[in-house]
Amino acid sequence: MLIDMLKGKIHRATVTQADLEYVGSITIDETLMEASGILEYEKVQIADVNNGARFETYVIAGPRDSGVICLNGATARCASVGDKVIIMNYAQFEPEEAKHAKPYVVLVDDENRLTKRVRYEKHGLLAEEL
């Protein structure tokens, strides 16, 4: 049996663009992708902090250090430019592996520049908070 577990997330990024006419997906700054462990074309779940919507799509790499968070295609209807979003990816683990999984948390400023990369520890606390 495999268990779906959080692998990493980009916390409270700001949506910078929305392109309804694009084929689909979310474009994410490549620096943020690498820091959170998100791969190009990987499925992600997005939670809009402003309106509570949750939706899934796949990722396209955006220019490194550009701060881009662009909702493409139908996902452009799920959040507005300026909204804060949480972008999460998941992995499947065997139960014993899952007990020791510690997801990456990528924190950004209002321009989506990486400010900190930490791991979750016990009880949802970040490593630095223990």
Swiss-Prot record:
One Pfam family per UniProt: Asp_decarbox
Q: Its principal location?
A: cytoplasm
Sites of Pyruvic acid (Ser) modification? S25
Please state where this protein is localized.
Cytoplasm
Q: Which residues bind substrate?
A: T57, G73, A74, T75
**Cofactor(s) for this UniProt protein:** pyruvate
Q: Which UniProt keywords apply?
A: Autocatalytic cleavage, Cytoplasm, Decarboxylase, Lyase, Pantothenate biosynthesis, Pyruvate, Schiff base, Zymogen
Record InterPro entries: Asp_de-COase-like_dom_sf (IPR009010), Asp_decarbox (IPR003190)
Respond yes or no to whether keyword Ubl conjugation is given for this record: no
Which superkingdom, per the lineage? Bacteria
Biological process per Gene Ontology, one example term:
alanine biosynthetic process
Q: In which pathway does it act?
A: Cofactor biosynthesis; (R)-pantothenate biosynthesis; beta-alanine from L-aspartate: step 1/1
GO terms for molecular function, please?
aspartate 1-decarboxylase activity
Q: What does this protein do?
A: Catalyzes the pyruvoyl-dependent decarboxylation of aspartate to produce beta-alanine.
PANTHER family xrefs? ASPARTATE 1-DECARBOXYLASE
Q: Which family does it belong to?
A: Belongs to the PanD family.
Q: How does it assemble?
A: Heterooctamer of four alpha and four beta subunits.
What protein does this entry describe?
Aspartate 1-decarboxylase
Q: Which organism is it from?
A: Lactiplantibacillus plantarum (strain ATCC BAA-793 / NCIMB 8826 / WCFS1) (Lactobacillus plantarum)
Q: Which taxonomic lineage is given here?
A: Bacteria, Bacillati, Bacillota, Bacilli, Lactobacillales
Gene that this sequence comes from? panD
